[in-house]
């Protein structure tokens, strides 16, 4: 009887252990597959070598001498004589000064991490309203951190915005080792991100890293805002690309992209445009699951100390998150593992709820019609 009881207990423990291992495998297996298997095959041909050569010999003087042709506000001297480790370009809407102020008080206030200089600037297009433009001018005079391109800041012009800001980085901040493109809705853990980049310092070239999206199909619905005609992009799938909420590229990649901008179709989403440019120059996007992509990561301290970004973070949540990840309290391996599991589960639940609510809304609209 005692032996049978012991055996049953052993079997129970084995069953529990098996389920724990299976749970972790299912939870983190997707990230593992993304990290190691969802990459395009690298290639280097004569054309790619020519692009690299053009990028090295790039003459930026015509752009520098015609500032008013491209930018309303340029901050053209802000990088002069400085060696910047990370240039953060925060893509912001012209009328969202409140959000910019909040970022300036939190993660955007960082000027160095582990002694490595950080420069944070806001990237804008032109507003429709003259009043908003006057407010932006005042904000720029006060903070000296706004770049404003000469194009209307609209959803249709986000590719133009990407081009203008990469162009700015190449022309006016050529000593920046890395360039972070990030949306204003996104929270960034700069200490964690810089620590990751420091491990890449021996490989400063060909860096294009973020949450990589694989086998995304172009939208062929003419009624949809993101419609892409076959004449613009005839392939079945887009090339792998980094989700546009946040990604990083090295300075040499920015220069190569500047060279090929005019050869790439523009009637695609902005982040896809960057991915097509990357393919054009023979570049493989590097995936990291620590970039959240479109997803909002539910807040807890140890989780936010580990990840690089979280999208759609609310205004009240941002100061709390920034304060707690900088409180000096380190997380143990157990705490980090446990809270990462919690974060991931809650994020999946939130995604499911949004999908479910979206389905209900679509059905209601269908019956209303």
Swiss-Prot record:
Belongs to the glycosyltransferase 31 family. Glycans are attached at residues 66, 96, 109. The chain crosses the membrane at residues 13-33. It comes from Homo sapiens (Human). Putative glycosyltransferase that could catalyze the transfer of galactose residues from UDP-alpha-D-galactose. Residues 34-369 are lumenal. It holds the Pfam family Galactosyl_T. It is found in: Golgi apparatus membrane. Its main location: Golgi. It is an enzyme of class 2 (transferase). This is Beta-1,3-galactosyltransferase 9. Keywords: Glycoprotein, Glycosyltransferase, Golgi apparatus, Membrane, Signal-anchor, Transferase, Transmembrane, Transmembrane helix. The keyword Metal-binding does not apply. It is a single-pass type II membrane protein. One of its GO terms (molecular function) is glycosyltransferase activity. It comes from the Eukaryota. GO terms for biological process: protein O-linked glycosylation. GO terms for cellular component: Golgi membrane.
């Amino acid at each position: 009887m005692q032996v049978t009881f012991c055996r049953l207990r052993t079997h129970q423990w084995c069953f529990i252990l098996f389920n724990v291992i299976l749970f972790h495998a299912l939870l983190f297996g997707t990230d593992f597959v993304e990290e190691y298997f969802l990459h395009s095959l690298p290639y280097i041909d004569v054309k790619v070598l020519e692009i690299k050569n053009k990028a090295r010999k790039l003459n930026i003087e015509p752009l520098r001498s015609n500032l008013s042709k491209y930018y309303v506000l340029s901050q053209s001297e802000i990088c002069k004589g400085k060696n910047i480790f990370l240039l953060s370009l925060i893509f912001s809407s012209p009328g969202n000064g409140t959000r910019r102020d909040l970022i300036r008080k939190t993660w955007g206030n960082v000027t160095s991490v582990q002694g490595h200089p950080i420069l944070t600037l806001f990237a804008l297009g032109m507003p429709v309203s003259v009043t908003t433009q006057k407010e932006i001018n005042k904000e720029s005079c006060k903070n000296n951190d706004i770049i404003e391109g000469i194009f209307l800041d609209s959803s249709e012009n986000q590719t133009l915005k990407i081009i203008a800001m990469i162009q700015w980085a190449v022309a006016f901040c050529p000593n920046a080792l890395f360039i972070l493109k990030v949306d204003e809705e996104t929270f960034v853990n700069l200490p964690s991100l810089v620590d990751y980049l420091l491990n890449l310092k021996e490989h400063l070239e060909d860096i294009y890293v973020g949450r990589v999206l694989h086998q995304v199909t172009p939208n062929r619905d003419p009624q949809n805002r993101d419609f892409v005609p076959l004449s613009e992009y005839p392939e079945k799938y887009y090339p792998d690309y980094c989700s546009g909420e946040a990604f990083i590229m090295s300075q040499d990649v920015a220069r190569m992209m500047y060279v090929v901008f005019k050869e790439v179709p523009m009637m695609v989403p902005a982040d896809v445009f960057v991915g097509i440019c990357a393919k054009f120059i023979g570049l493989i996007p590097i995936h990291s699951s620590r970039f959240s992509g479109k997803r909002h990561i539910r807040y807890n301290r140890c989780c936010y100390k580990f990840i690089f970004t979280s999208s759609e973070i609310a205004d009240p949540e941002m100061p709390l998150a920034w304060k707690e990840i900088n409180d000096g309290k380190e997380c143990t391996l157990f705490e980090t593992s446990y809270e990462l599991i919690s974060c991931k589960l809650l994020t999946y639940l939130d995604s499911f709820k949004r999908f479910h609510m979206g389905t209900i809304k679509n059905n209601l609209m269908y019956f209303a019609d």
